[in-house]
Amino acid sequence: MLSYSTGRRKCAVAQLRFFSGNGKIVVNGCSLDYYFQHNSAFTKIIRSPLKLLNLELLYDFIIVVKGGGLSGQAGAIRLAIARVLAGLSPSNRSSLKSKRYLTRDSRIKERKKYGLKKARKAPQFSKR
């Protein structure tokens, strides 16, 4: 194992182990395509830091991801991969930072307030 990293997005937390290998990505014991239901949008999000640095076929990743939905999990995995690749060399870090792959997206679900139907949706107002 070369390195370890963690990424978070919405309610999802991804823990990543990083090995030298041939580009295999395993998520929760399944292949990347199978876990994300062959959805190319999610796999594109996850592979984008690797594609940017042309490192797609050099490293293997074993990822355990919990919480959230598929979109949040894909974002968490992308952040974890970007953090691990940024630690390899300073030039990687600058190119990943320019594309904002190292920025933690802090937007989370707003809590529901009492007296309201949802976080901001109020019941219909009647004057009379």
UniProtKB/Swiss-Prot annotation:
Gene3D superfamilies: 3.30.230.10. Residues 106-128 are annotated as: Disordered. GO terms for cellular component: chloroplast; small ribosomal subunit. It is found in: Plastid, Chloroplast. Residues 109-128 have a biased composition (Basic residues). It comes from the Eukaryota. Pfam families: Ribosomal_S9 (PF00380). Coiled coil: none annotated. GO terms for biological process: translation. One of its GO terms (molecular function) is structural constituent of ribosome. Keywords: Chloroplast, Plastid, Ribonucleoprotein, Ribosomal protein. InterPro entries: Ribosomal_Su5_D2-typ_SF, Ribosomal_uS9, Ribosomal_uS9_bac/plastid, Ribosomal_uS9_CS, Ribsml_uS5_D2-typ_fold_subgr. Belongs to the universal ribosomal protein uS9 family. This is Small ribosomal subunit protein uS9c. It comes from Cyanidium caldarium (Red alga). The lineage of its organism: Eukaryota, Rhodophyta, Bangiophyceae, Cyanidiales, Cyanidiaceae.
